[in-house]
A protein has these predicted regions:
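PP2C/PPM-type serine/threonine phosphatase catalytic domain
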Residues: 1-241
C-alpha cells in the first residue's frame, strides 16, 4: 500500500486543529496505519487534543507486542488515548473541553479495518465512491430519524455538532468496519473541512483525474479552499496494491 497525507489550515481559521498520520510501513503488529483527527476546544486545546491522541495511539500500537488482531489494536489504542486525553483536559483550565474526532484504518491481507469516533470519514474509491464510516453527529441522527434530508445537512445550523469524541467520556464509543479490497482501490480519510466544502461526486472525479495520490490530495485541498475553506482541511489518500 502507498499513501500520501496533507493538512491545510483553510481560509477562515487562525489555527490548524487537525492532525494526520500515514505510515505505509508496519507500526507494531499492524502492517500500515492511517489516521485523521479533527480537534476541538478553545485556545490551543483542539490542536493539542488531535496531536496528542494520534501520538498516544501510535505509541500504544508500537509497544503492544501480544495483540495482533487489527480491530483489537485500534480499539485498545483509542480507549488508551481517550483516558489520557481526559486526564490532560482535567489538568489545566485551558484544556477544558478538549477532544477530537478519530478515523483510523489499517489494511492487512486484502482487508480494510476502520475505527471511527466523530465525523471524520473514510471513503472507499474505486469506480465510484462509498462512505464507509457513519458520522456521529446531530445531523446524521436527524437524517436517520427522517427529520431532514441528507441534501440539507450541509446547510443545517447544527452541522458541526458531533455526538461522540475522544477525550469526553469513559468509555468512548467506537464504531468498526471491515471491507474486502481489490487491487487499485483507494482509501480517503478526511476531516469535515473537506466534506463540508466538496461534494462526494466531485471528490471522486478529482481523484480519478489525478495522476498520483499527491496530486489528488492537493487538488482536494485546493477545491475545498476554492469553495470557501471554512475549516481546516485534512486528507490521507492511500492505494491498495
Amino acid at each position: 500500500m502507498k499513501a500520501y497525507s496533507i493538512t491545510d489550515i483553510g481560509r477562515r481559521r487562525t489555527m490548524n486543529q487537525d492532525y494526520v498520520y500515514a505510515s505505509e510501513q508496519p507500526v507494531g503488529n499492524l502492517k500500515n496505519l492511517l489516521i485523521v483527527a479533527d480537534g476541538m476546544g478553545g485556545h490551543n486545546a483542539g490542536d493539542l487534543a488531535s496531536r496528542y491522541t494520534v501520538e498516544l495511539m501510535v505509541e500504544y500500537i508500537t509497544n503492544e507486542k501480544d495483540e495482533t488482531r487489527p480491530v483489537s489494536l485500534l480499539s485498545s489504542a483509542i480507549h488508551h488515548a481517550n483516558e489520557l486525553v481526559m486526564e490532560k483536559a482535567r489538568s489545566a483550565k485551558e484544556y477544558e473541553g478538549m477532544g477530537t474526532t478519530i478515523v483510523a484504518a489499517t489494511v492487512t491481507d486484502g482487508c480494510l479495518y476502520v475505527a471511527n469516533v466523530g465525523d471524520s470519514r473514510l471513503y472507499l474509491i474505486d469506480q465510484g465512491i462509498e462512505q464507509i464510516t457513519r458520522d456521529h453527529s446531530i445531523v446524521e441522527e436527524m437524517i436517520r430519524m427522517g427529520e431532514i434530508q441528507r441534501k440539507d445537512a450541509k446547510s443545517h445550523p447544527d452541522r458541526n455538532v458531533i455526538t461522540r469524541a475522544v477525550g469526553v467520556h469513559v468509555p468512548v464509543r467506537v464504531d468498526f468496519f471491515d471491507v474486502k479490497l481489490e487491487k487499485g482501490d483507494k482509501l480517503l480519510l478526511c476531516s469535515d473541512g473537506l466534506t463540508n466544502m466538496v461534494e462526494d461526486e466531485d471528490i471522486l472525479q478529482l481523484v480519478k483525474k489525478s495522476a498520483s495520490l499527491k496530486e489528488a490530495a492537493e487538488r482536494l485541498v485546493t477545491e475545498a479552499n476554492k469553495n470557501g475553506g471554512k475549516d481546516n482541511i485534512s486528507v490521507v489518500l492511500a492505494e491498495y496494491e
